[in-house]
Amino acid sequence: MAGQGDCCVKVAVRIRPQLSKEKIEGCHICTSVTPGEPQVLLGKDKAFTYDFVFDLDTWQEQIYSTCVSKLIEGCFEGYNATVLAYGQTGAGKTYTMGTGFDTVTSEEEQGIIPRAIAHLFRGIDERKRRAQEKGVTGPEFKVSAQFLELYNEEILDLFDSTRDPDARHRRSNIKIHEDANGGIYTTGVTSRLINSQEELIQCLKQGALSRTTASTQMNVQSSRSHAIFTIHLCQMRVCAQPDLVNETVTGLPDGAAPTGTEYETLTAKFHFVDLAGSERLKRTGATGERAKEGISINCGLLALGNVISALGDQSKKVVHVPYRDSKLTRLLQDSLGGNSQTIMIACVSPSDRDFMETLNTLKYANRARNIKNKVVVNQDKTSQQISALRAEIARLQMELMEYKAGKRVIGEDGTEGYSDLFRENAMLQKENGALRLRVKAMQEAIDAINNRVTQLMSQEANLLLAKAGDGNEAIGALIQNYIREIEELRTKLLESEAMNESLRRSLSRASARNPYSLGASPAGPAFGGSPATSMEDASEVIRKAKQDLERLKKKEVRQRRKSPEKEAFKKRAKLQAENSEETDENEAEEEEEERDESGCEEEEGREDEDEDSGSEESLVDSDSDPEEKEVNFQADLADLTCEIEIKQKLIDELENSQRRLQTLKHQYEEKLILLQNKIRDTQLERDRVLQNLSTMECYTEEKANKIKADYEKRLREMNRDLQKLQAAQKEHARLLKNQSRYERELKKLQAEVAEMKKAKVALMKQMREEQQRRRLVETKRNREIAQLKKEQRRQEFQIRALESQKRQQEIVLRRKTQEVSALRRLAKPMSERVAGRVGLKPPNMDSGAEVSASTTSSEAESGARSVSSIVRQWNRKIDHFLGDRPTATVNGGRPARKKFQKKGASQSFSKAARLKWQSLERRIIDIVMQRMTIVNLEADMERLIKKREELFLLQEALRRKREHLQAESPEEEKGLQELAEEIEVLAANIDYINDSITDCQATIVQLEETKEELDSTDTSVVISSCSLAEARLLLDNFLKASIDKGLQVAQKEAQIRLLEGRLRQTDMTGSSQNHLLLDALREKAEAHPELQALIYNVQHENGYASTDEEVSEFSEGSFSQSFTMKGSTSHDDFKFKGEPKLSAQMKAVSAECLGPPLDSSTKNITKSLASLVEIKEDGVGFSIRDPYYRDKVSRTVSLPTRGSTFPRQSRGATDTSPLTRRKSYDRGQPIRSTDMGFTPPSSPPTRPRNDRNVFSRLTSNQSQGSALDKSDDSDSSLSEVLRGIITPIGGAKGARTAPLQCISMAEGHTKPILCLDATDELLFTGSKDRSCKMWNLVTGQEIAALKGHPNNVVSIKYCSHSGLVFSVSSSYIKVWDIRDSAKCIRTLTSSGQVISGDACIATSTRAITSAQGEHQINQMALSPSGSMLYVASGNAVRIWELNRFQPIGKLTGHIGPVMCLTVTQTSNQHDLVVTGSKDHYVKMFQLGDCVTGTIGPTHNFEPPHYDGIECLAIQGDILFSGSRDNGIKKWDLDQQELIQQIPNAHKDWVCALAFVPGRPMLLSACRAGFIKVWNVDNFTPIGEIKGHDSPINAICTNSKHIFTASSDCRVKLWNYVPGLTPCLPRRVLAIKGRAPPCPDLPPPPLTLPILPFPVFPPPRSELLLHVT
């Protein structure tokens, strides 16, 4: 076929501009284009190279002219073409292709298809017009179009007007077929014949509007189908005749058509493919029909990607190309790997939120570059045959011409070859070029020598002048210029003389050869012979010269036969070189030969004969001497060659002279005729004058004089004209002379310019080569660096994989060890009592317990036989597989030891198969881990992008607020400045998020490169190298692995269902308990208004309207208790815990109902509830003041909160392993019928230290930071029935060595206490239970509870000047007025807003996150005067003026969140603020009289701590700082320097610092619960005491006591014991109860009746308990 060839699919990348929405949301551009190179960079350093790359500012016209214009021109030559637009949804594919006609577009915004249509019809008109101008038959064109839509894998015809647009899901009748040549065509498709551009545009618009589009979250008008617009072009034109045929065969001029006109038919089709965008359902938000469309689109694109991967496989491993997997790939089979010129335009988005889609699109397009198409011209068979024959004729004609010209010859053996003349000509041309180079080099050497001579002569002249004493630089320069000019003139003079001599000799030769040329003078025929005679003579001379030349050629042939050919070539070259040096002798010989030719021809003939005979004689004489013979031959041959050349030159000159003679002849004849006419006119004038003179009758003297004067005047005028003409002639001669000189100079300058250009070209070429070499070296180095980086990443990845594998193995080993130990315990013999207890089975166990027990037993049994059975099964399979017969089993089914024969082949087989399976397993693990990593990184990037969008919206709102404030009150500088600061903070956060997004993108790119490396090691190599037996073994392993994974999934699902069932059951139990409690309290509340008010508050807070309402919430206590009940498998535990906890709670309530009436004089609800303190049952009493029982009772009356979550303690308690249950089961606790002792629960365990790097904590979100991590996922009830009380504690004997003595303990909070503040009369505490309590230190009672906080209360302060209490929770500061029933009067926010009243009153559940634009407040401090409030929020401290409740400034300078601060006053009554942050630094801020705006730190204390700062304390000029690095530092505020530091002051975080009242002693408390006393002066320890079993969160003092708040929900009051020496720490035992018993005795037990059947809650009327 004509024009066959391979061409690769070209790929262009277009980066669309950012949308306004993306700019508003703060999306950054993650792509960049290398200037001048078709390369696009994604992220930081991931580069992709394509054929074309178009950046953001590229116009439609540029894309079309660069990519598609050549394809349209190719269609006119019969080549198919395809343009594909690929990319994600909203990347600009439809806009680029130009199929979106839903809006009016300008001409500049027209896409590829409208421009291609215009180009097509413009080309048709141009070709018709060109043919008309040449006068040949114009081509005929036929254009047709089709428009197909692939919707949900169904082909729809968009030109079919009869199709129902709503019936898209019906099957269409369009079929795809393949012709004999592999071309794809469709049947059942409407094909419209097109006659004009407007008609085709209208068809395109009609089809585009019929295309399926819909709206998604990513694009308002999203294409929901693939569209293929096809243009078919059929062209019939006159066959183009080759130039060789026109000139040599037909004899017609080029371009003229021959008489027999032949036509050829060309066809072409052009596909314009607008693919639908690749989608992610979670980004498009598609559901229902849109989701199905997206799935279909992605399936088609996946099939297209598989085809591209198969075609672009460089290793050529893929034999089958899956074209039939999708109708899309079937339709595009021509375009991908077939007969088509294809270009793919990949449209991508530059925004970083589309990073993954952009990366996938670029990788997709990069694979398409490797596809090679086989492009041929689509001709009919007749035209193809004619073209082939015409090409054959042209080739034969060219070969014939070469034979005629002597270029080709036929050897004796019949082989073709080139003639000697052709080879000689080529050799001479090469030699001529070498001589030219030599002449050029010599000329340069001459110029250099001339410059050197000039320089030397000038130096000589300068020396002479210097000796004469007249030396001067100007004179020397002038002399040098003169000498240079003299040398140049001398050189030109020599050249002119040589040229003059050459011309003179040429003229003498011409005059000697052509004596008749003198007769052709302008004098006319009178001075020579006739012109005809001279012409005949010249012709005769030429004829004779040609004869002479033929004779010499024959002589040379004879000589050549006698001399070897090789030596002749060498001698001729040598003689020609010598000939150039002996010019004078040759010229003399030429003159003699010319004279001989022009003088006497007969004598010349005789001389020639004599020369021939002489040469023959010399040849005969030289036969005796071979060397002389050879030399003579070569000399004669060279002479003949030179003579032939001279004769040839003479003949050429004669012919030229002949032509010049003819020209002169014509000129002289014309001039002669002109002169003859002039003579004739003069004679006529003379005759006329004579006639007039004769006829004159009266001739007077006067008239004669007049005539004479006229003639003289005319003569003078003619003489004057003659002089002018002569002057003009001289001027003309001078100009001609100057012109020749100018021409010589011009030629010389042109030659110099040409040489300079050549030198420039050589230098440019050298520079380009050097640059290319440097680029190659740099590319190689970069490739090596990238390879090393990849190797490093691969090794790191392998290390991580090995570490993970090791951890997994350790976990599996630990689990197996536990199973083995459990099985061993099961195998131990049991006592009869235990065995009997095991035999007992509870009659009605709940479903959860049954499932748990069955699961446990099945796990135990399966664990006992899992290892051995798997090993036996595996051995049997291997034995059966290898052909070994198993031996008999002995000892109850245990296989006996087999005697295997030694078979090296089987051993090697098993080892090779095992190695292959291990390699495949490692590969699978690597792929899974890598994909998990990529998915996690994508999730992180999406989360960061969403966070950035939120911050941008907030920033935009603040900007609008600032603009509004500027417009309304421009003088409000304070508010504007605060808004500007907040905007700056948001901008900093956005920059940090952008950096994090960039890091995620870089990591994803690195992982993708590693993924490509893993993909390169294809598992098909391992699988293809397997034998049949190995393949079976691998298949068996895969089957086992899949079964194991399925089993794990089923177990996880069963666990989830079990937990869901427990959750529902707990929900129902809690609901019923709450209803019963409310009903019981309502009955009791009829006589007690206080209880009625409490019940009303509880219902209002928790949303209970009536007892009939179904409640889905559940309490913390019921959740943990029900889990405990279900988790126990012991019979004892079941008998105790099988009775629902509701019964105990109902017993408590009923006992209260049946007890003695309350004292009527007691009106306080606290006193009324205090009657519930003593509850007796079965003759045994217990005190609710005991924290354990009090906690149980408090849970009884606590009601759930909506939206509550499971507490950590309950989650930890419920997750009891079967092993733990088995331990309790095996121990077999005895049943006690009379009493059952309880031990108080241990304190909550201390929090484990965060193992993260401290610097990573600094960069964490500031809103998540809080002092001592005071955040809890759990929630508690807002309603507390019991009020707190301060219980005095008697000092234990032998406690005299402790520096502190605990005197009282305050209890009342249900969660850890995080903060406290105290005066001499009042104590304020804040807890994780979202409440604050106010205590009366005089009476030891709780005064009020300040509730309604959104989260943990992390800081509380009391202002004695104003009587206000400030409490901090989340991002809010509540201001309480305790003088007026303790109500919240204002709410301050971290952003500086002031809200009247309680802004959190509607918050019934725990708020885990802060509001938008707010930050977590970690601590606050009051100024000593009480007029300023300093609030640490984020990495700044906001200053509030309490007189107006307005923010007036900010303290900035920290990088991390500010965790603590303290305030003191300087000598000039100015506030001095010291802050500590997570960035390890302590900063000091000294404030002046006017505090406004942003204030920077006065001093940064160096060196910093090794971790975050937790607490600060100031006494005088001494500052103490405690840190998470377990150390305390002592600073001097005056000198602003470090005095002393103790690195390990505690074994855990230093959480609180304070001073002993009235003494120079420092108190420090840590997270381990220890309190240390230090001497302030020398910073030495005085004593240590174990203050709490849980972390101590805060410490404060008043004038008498020391208060410590701990996570054990208690506040202890301490007194300092004076006069003690440093001692070892001792444990402080908290004695519970008003009448404290012995500390070592357990609390009074609670006895419950043992029932042989499960206890269910009785009806309400039967809720009776007897108190004994």
UniProtKB/Swiss-Prot annotation:
Effect seen on changing T96N: Abolishes processive activity
InterPro entries associated with the record: KIF21A/B_hel_1, KIF21A/B_hel_2, Kinesin-like_fam, Kinesin_motor_CS, Kinesin_motor_dom, Kinesin_motor_dom_sf, P-loop_NTPase, WD40/YVTN_repeat-like_dom_sf
Cell compartment(s), UniProt: Cytoplasm, Cytoskeleton; Cell projection, Dendrite; Cell projection, Growth cone; Cell projection, Axon
Residues found modified as Phosphothreonine: T583, T1239
Interaction with TRIM3: annotated span: 401-1100
Tissue expression notes: Expressed in brain (at protein level). Expressed in spleen and at lower levels in testes.
Bias type Low complexity, positions: 847-866
GO annotation (BP), single: retrograde dendritic transport
Coiled-coil residues: 372-465, 924-1019
SUPFAM superfamilies in UniProt: P-loop containing nucleoside triphosphate hydrolases (SSF52540), Prefoldin (SSF46579), WD40 repeat-like (SSF50978)
Superkingdom, taxonomy of origin: Eukaryota
Keyword annotations of the record: ATP-binding, Cell projection, Coiled coil, Cytoplasm, Cytoplasmic vesicle, Cytoskeleton, Microtubule, Motor protein, Nucleotide-binding, Phosphoprotein, Repeat, WD repeat
Residues recorded as bearing Phosphoserine in the entry: S580, S1150, S1168, S1217, S1243
Residues annotated as domain Kinesin motor: 8-371
Residue ranges of the region described as Disordered: 553-629, 837-866, 1199-1253
Stored CDD domains: KISc_KIF4 (cd01372), Rcc_KIF21B (cd22262), WD40 (cd00200)
UniProt feature, compositional bias: Polar residues: 1199-1219
Mutant lacking the gene: phenotype: Mutant mice exhibit behavioral changes involving learning and memory deficits.
Family: Belongs to the TRAFAC class myosin-kinesin ATPase superfamily. Kinesin family.
This protein's name: Kinesin-like protein KIF21B
Organism taxonomic ancestry: Eukaryota, Metazoa, Chordata, Craniata, Vertebrata
